[in-house]
Every structure is written in C-alpha cells, then in structure tokens.
Amino acid sequence: MGELMAFLLPLIIVLMVKHSDSRTHSLRYFRLGVSDPIHGVPEFISVGYVDSHPITTYDSVTRQKEPRAPWMAENLAPDHWERYTQLLRGWQQMFKVELKRLQRHYNHSGSHTYQRMIGCELLEDGSTTGFLQYAYDGQDFLIFNKDTLSWLAVDNVAHTIKQAWEANQHELLYQKNWLEEECIAWLKRFLEYGKDILQRTEPPLVRVNRKETFPGVTALFCKAHGFYPPEIYMTWMKNGEEIVQEIDYGDILPSGDGTYQTWASVELDPQSSNLYSCHVEHCGVHMVLQVPQESETIPLVMKAVSGSIVLVIVLAGVGVLVWRRRPREQNGAIYLPTPDR
C-alpha cells in the first residue's frame, strides 16, 4: 500500500496545484475501484488529503480506515476510525457492484476503473467551493452541480444514472449540505489539528540559468524549489512587460521532503537586446531576478523595494536566491553561489 500511495500522490498533486499566489486549503477524498486488478493493487482504495498531505487510507486488503498523519491519530478517537471503517466497507461493495454494471452497459471486460472525488476548498478571502464527480477509466463520467442540484452526464450510460440519481431529491440536498457545511467544518478542524504542518510557510530557493534546449535555440529557466505552501506565481517579463504567451511552465510537483518545486522558461532571441526578468510571488512576498545580457559583466546587486526582493545576477555563474521573512519592514536576501557542475 505504501508503494501505491507513493505512486498515487504525485498524480493527485499535479491535478490539485495551480500557479497562483493565493493560498487555498482543501479537503479531498478519492475512491478508486478496479475490476480484475493486477497483482499488488487492491480492488478498492480510499485516500483522504488535506491540501497535498495524505490524512487517511482504506483499502480492500486491510479493510480498515487508518490515519496517515500523526496529528490525525492524536486527535480522533478510536470510535471515529471504526465508524468510518464500516462506512467504507459499504462503499467497497457498492463500487464493486457499480463497476460491474458499467462494464455491462459498455460491453467491457478485463480491467477497468471507477473513481469518485469529493471535497471542498477554503479560499484566502473566506469563500468556499465544493465538488463531487465520478470517472470511468480515468475520464469524466458524472459531475455534480450543487447549485442546481443536478448531475452533468457525459454520455448515454451516464445519462441513465443521472436520471435515477436526480429522482432522489433528499440525496441531492444531503450532498449539497455536505459540500457546503460538513466538508468545510471538517477542513477547519483538520487545519487546526495539523496547523504546525499545514499552515507553515517555507520560502522558495530561486535560481535562473541559461540552457541550449535545441541546436541554435537558447532558453532562460527560472527554477523555484523548497517552498511551501505549493501556491506560487512565476512569470517572465521582457523589457518590463509580461510575456505570458511565450512562457512554458512546469508542473508544481512535490520534492519528497514536504516542499515543492516548479519552473518557468522563455526562449531568447539571439538577435535582440531584450532585457528579461523572472518574477516570483509566494505568500505575499515578491521577488525579481533581473537577467543582464550575456555579454555584460555586472556585479551582484540586491535590494528591497516596497517589500520586494530584487536581484541582478550574471549568468556566467549560476546562483541561488534564498529569501526569508524578516521582522516587519525588513526584507533581505542571501545569495549562495552554486558549485560548478
């Protein structure tokens, strides 16, 4: 199960995290049913996450809901785990029945998957969102609209199920209430339990380097790593103007130590004298790495401007910018030259 979780977590994180400086907290539960599973894969798995942190697991092998975070085990009584274990055993059987029914409808045999994701988000401004959806073989199948109390069906098979589910008004109202009230209440509760982990801030280490991506094509890469929470905004500016259409972005991925990494790149025009700068925002702090022309020789310059950190870096020696929160009205940076490769 540990190896499977290690495989599932990065896939979920890629879907969950976007390039944004606005801090959002989320609670999500993923359930996966597999027909004819390969060796080592349970036929039913349920995992819970607060933000990107796994908090609970259940699978058809152990048949027990268990905590995945110490602060969950410390704060929830044994009867909580037993109660939800019984509920998930029911979900396990339900998924098995529904997956067989879908295979009959589609005339499928062999190994197929049925997935459910339910959860909510608490945004920085206090507003909330909620979501509930199903997928078959990794493709959207049914999506719940809590505002209209209806399901969006993607094909005729899904439409048949949609009609049956929408006939149960009590269940629709229950799902709406769970998404808008119960889920948010649980999320706030879990955020308090794990506040030392979930509400911490670790600033990114940022560096810029120049790389030949193809023969005759050179790109600037702005790379950030070691940061938490995963919400971060990165962009390139050319001559002081943002160039969104010219930028390639990497996914925000876990680094394996509880922090995250990502990058943004832009191709250089070798015939121009454009001035490029990488802008990074994380938890309200803004950094600018100004990149001089390759032919220039400029000493390292760094200064704080209106709460921002500005660093001019010569690319002949790639460097890393480390920034940390300082006492109010004090911002600073430490420049750490990287060893030669």
UniProtKB/Swiss-Prot annotation:
UniProt keywords (A-Z) are: Cell membrane, Disulfide bond, Endoplasmic reticulum, Endosome, Glycoprotein, Golgi apparatus, Immunity, Immunoglobulin domain, Innate immunity, Membrane, MHC I, Signal, Transmembrane, Transmembrane helix
Instruction: Give binding positions for 7-hydroxy-6-methyl-8-(1-D-ribityl)lumazine.
Output: 31, 46, 65, 116, 174-175
Subcellular localization, as worded in the UniProt entry: Cell membrane; Endoplasmic reticulum membrane; Golgi apparatus membrane; Early endosome membrane
User: What GO CC annotations are associated with the protein?
Assistant: early endosome membrane; endoplasmic reticulum membrane; external side of plasma membrane; extracellular space; Golgi membrane; late endosome membrane; MHC class I protein complex
The residues exposed to the Cytoplasmic compartment are: 324-341
Q: Which stretches of this protein does UniProt put in the Extracellular compartment?
A: 23-302
Residues binding 5-(2-oxopropylideneamino)-6-(D-ribitylamino)uracil, per UniProt: 31, 46, 65, 116, 174-175
Chain residues that bind 2-amino-4-oxopteridine-6-carbaldehyde = 65
The residues that cross the membrane are 303-323
Record's InterPro entries?
Answer: Ig-like_dom, Ig-like_dom_sf, Ig-like_fold, Ig/MHC_CS, Ig_C1-set, MHC_class-I_related, MHC_I-like_Ag-recog, MHC_I-like_Ag-recog_sf
Annotated spans, Alpha-2: 110-201
Q: Is Ion transport among the key words of this record? A: no
Say which family it is in.
Belongs to the MHC class I family.
Oligomer and partners: Heterotrimer that consists of MR1, B2M and metabolite antigen. Major classes of metabolite ligands presented by MR1 include riboflavin-related antigens, pyrimidines and ribityl lumazines, nucleobase adducts and folate derivatives. Forms reversible covalent Schiff base complexes with microbial pyrimidine-based metabolite, which serves as a molecular switch triggering complete folding, stable association with B2M and translocation of the ternary complex from endoplasmic reticulum to the plasma membrane. Alternatively, forms non-Schiff base complexes with ribityl lumazines.
Name of the featured protein: Major histocompatibility complex class I-related protein 1
Task: Give the organism, scientific name.
Answer: Pan troglodytes
